[in-house]
């Protein structure tokens, strides 16, 4: 007998949301890398993407191990860039009247 459990669904970005996030990132930082190879890892964010359109995006953290790896070292200097990016996405999507 073989027991088989489906774990996480595929994490599939919505093209429109991915493009929007990349455009805002470029406006905030002046550059964006959209030429990364797809990853085969599981991510619980995929459940959210099954319910609503969106995009799972990497901010960039320099030359370190991936998140959840014991050797991962978060680069605190990325915080202002990430904060500015998220704030600009919110302000662009929901501008003040």
Q: What is the predicted role of each segment?
A:
Residues 1-97:
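Metal-dependent amide/peptide-bond hydrolase catalytic core
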């Amino acid at each position: 007998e073989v027991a088989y459990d489906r774990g996480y669904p595929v994490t599939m970005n919505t093209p429109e949301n991915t493009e929007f996030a990349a455009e805002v990132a470029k406006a905030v930082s002046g550059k964006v890398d959209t030429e990364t190879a797809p990853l085969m890892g599981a991510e619980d964010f995929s459940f959210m993407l099954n319910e609503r359109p969106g995009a799972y995006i990497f901010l960039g953290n320099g030359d370190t191990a991936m998140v959840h790896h014991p050797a991962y070292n978060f680069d605190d200097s990325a915080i202002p860039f990430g904060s500015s990016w998220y704030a600009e996405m919110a302000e662009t999507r929901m501008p003040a009247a």
